[in-house]
């Protein structure tokens, strides 16, 4: 049944949902990659669609910006609409010199300055990690398409405009591949409610150098990331 944030019914969503932050990006994915896509949510403009990819039913829906927003949608998709796997597809900023623009990053783990997972885990540190099989399938899908990917820790920040830029030094020291704002929350929600999750991000800018991709470059690399996500779903079905 419908929730306060999703006006869909059970069965409207596939068991796997791709989730970009931008709802218009969700619309683009549905129109570009899915066959027979239909709109299944439009509450607050957070568009969701369900269609098929190579005959496999798949959904895509925006999750907004930040852990509070994405946590609402992830939780409701899992508990109210039977979603089993969530793949976040978005952008991230790099802090390490060896991580370049347009690199595709697979978030094996997600560090965070948010307290949401401590709230879940009785004020202890919770290791927010992706599902191993989903990570492996994404890596295999990338290899099959001859796309180089980076696999490791990312950082989910609560603030886009940070008052503590020295934290980037710490991130670099600890090998953080990219900074974004949602993965740790999605991983925590998935763990709490018995689902699986993965974040795949494209490096759209470099925090250290100020370098940025052009809109055309972002579009091309974004498409590679989406193809990796979709193909990984098919690989998961064959396990």
UniProtKB/Swiss-Prot annotation:
Pfam families in UniProt: PNP_UDP_1
Binding positions for a purine D-ribonucleoside per the UniProt entry: 5, 180-182, 204-205
Key word RNA-binding present: no
PROSITE patterns in the cross-refs: PNP_UDP_1
UniProt keywords, alphabetically: Glycosyltransferase, Transferase
Residues of the signal peptide: none
Superkingdom, natural source: Bacteria
Catalytic activity: a purine D-ribonucleoside + phosphate = a purine nucleobase + alpha-D-ribose 1-phosphate; a purine 2'-deoxy-D-ribonucleoside + phosphate = a purine nucleobase + 2-deoxy-alpha-D-ribose 1-phosphate
Binding site for phosphate: 21, 25, 44, 88-91
Subunit structure: Homohexamer; trimer of homodimers.
Family statement drawn from the similarity comment of this UniProt entry: Belongs to the PNP/UDP phosphorylase family.
Protein's recorded name: Purine nucleoside phosphorylase DeoD-type
Gene: deoD
């Amino acid at each position: 049944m419908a929730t306060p944030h999703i006006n869909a019914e059970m069965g409207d969503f596939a068991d796997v949902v791709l989730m970009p932050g931008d709802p218009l990006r969700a619309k683009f994915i549905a129109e570009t990659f899915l066959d027979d896509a239909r709109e299944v949510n439009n509450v607050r403009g957070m568009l969701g669609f369900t269609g098929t990819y190579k005959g496999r039913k798949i959904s895509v829906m925006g999750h907004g910006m930040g852990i509070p927003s994405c946590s609402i949608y992830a939780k409701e998709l899992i508990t109210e609409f039977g979603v089993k796997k969530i793949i976040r597809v978005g952008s991230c900023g790099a802090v390490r010199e060896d991580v370049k623009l347009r690199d595709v990053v697979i978030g094996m783990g997600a560090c965070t300055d948010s307290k949401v997972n401590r709230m879940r885990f009785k004020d202890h540190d919770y290791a927010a990690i992706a599902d191993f099989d989903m990570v492996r399938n994404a890596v295999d899908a990338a290899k099959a398409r001859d796309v180089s990917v980076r696999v490791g820790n990312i950082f989910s920040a609560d603030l886009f405009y940070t008052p503590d830029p020295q934290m980037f030094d710490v991130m670099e020291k600890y090998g953080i591949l990219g900074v974004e704002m949602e993965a740790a929350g999605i991983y925590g929600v998935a763990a709490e409610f018995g689902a699986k999750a993965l974040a795949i991000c494209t490096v759209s800018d470099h925090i250290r150098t100020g370098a940025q991709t052009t809109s055309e470059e972002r579009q091309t690399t974004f498409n590679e990331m989406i193809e990796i996500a979709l193909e990984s779903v098919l690989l998961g079905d064959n396990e």
